[in-house]
Amino acid sequence: MAPPRYLLMNSIWTAVAAVLMGGALAASQDDGSASPAETWPPNPERIALLPPVEFNLEEDTFSSEPIADADPKAGTPQRRRGGSPFGAAAPVSLGGFWAPPTDVVGQPATLGMNAQFARVAAPLVPPKEGEPLWIGIGRFGRLELSTDAILPDSQQPMPDQLWLVETGLTHIRPLARGGTLGGTFLFGSASDRPFAAGRDLTLMAIGFWNTPAANERDEWNFSLFYSPTSQLPYPLPGVAYAWRPSDALEAKLGVPASIEWRPDEKWTLSAAYFPLVNVAVEARRRLGNDWALLAFYRTDTQIYFLADRLIDAERLYVFDQRAAVGLERAIGSGFTVEALASWLFDRELFQGTNFTSGRTDSVEFDPGLGLSLQLLWRR
């Protein structure tokens, strides 16, 4: 059974999703004279030649990504169609994160963090409308733990550096009857000594099929997700109904689940959930053409294989919850700079064969500040 605080996180997702959906439906009823085609934003069906490719649901590298695939040059966000059901992110991003030392619970030590990360996703051949798309993906992350703390059960020192190095492909194929079929395969290593042994290798495999619903406005999303470095290291099927009652509201009802509501041209409110306890809630407000203010709550889980672990199936989990505020600035040519200040809490590090049971070497550390800066290119 999941610990009570994890059940609370899932309750937060449920409550926020209900509030957003209720508000969106109430707003659409109050504006009853408008049909879906007449509501904001205009021209929602712009064809995206480079659709969303980010499937990194649980190993998100220490900084927020907008759930909306907004183009900083456009006056309005665009509706997403035809990509993976697993979300969206910038094709190129790089940045860093820093959290000053805080006290380790039960040990005479402190623990500080800093991280650097980069990601790129690019089409391998020039994309063409209505044609299959092949996308190459590369990801890199380095997390440094500055501490004298030890893993209490094994009495081993805390790893000082953890690495994520992955590369792979995404394929998206339009179907003649509408909808898309595709998948992603990523291969690499997530470890304190990457590629040191075969047991330290990891992969992420995703298959998805999106098909239009009977009303031709909505979609059914079917998917299968597997990664040994996930909170649920087993194949996880997904079924979701993408409900679009208006151009201002889109909700994916099922697994993975999400909702995005744009009450006007300045505000975007969103929430997303993926098992087991991956929750993200975000509010974003445009401040003119170049600036945006954002605030979010989310959980963050980093998962690695320690090279010297005694049990092959054991993983190292680095977990926290965080609330953040920040600013985005569009600097031209599709580039955006994002600066965030976060409050990190419920912070822990532990080993286990899965996320909810069989834990060893559990280390908790005090809440504290986190600062991040990243550069994104959104095409």
Give the ranges of each region predicted by the language model.
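Sec-dependent N-terminal signal peptides
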Residues: 2-29
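Repeated loop/turn-to-beta-strand initiation elements of outer-membrane beta-barrel proteins
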Residues: 127-135, 176-182, 215-222, 247-251, ...
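Outer-membrane beta-barrel "beta-signal"
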Residues: 238-242, 325-335, 341, 362-379
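Outer membrane beta-barrel transmembrane domains
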Residues: 258-260, 266-274, 280-359
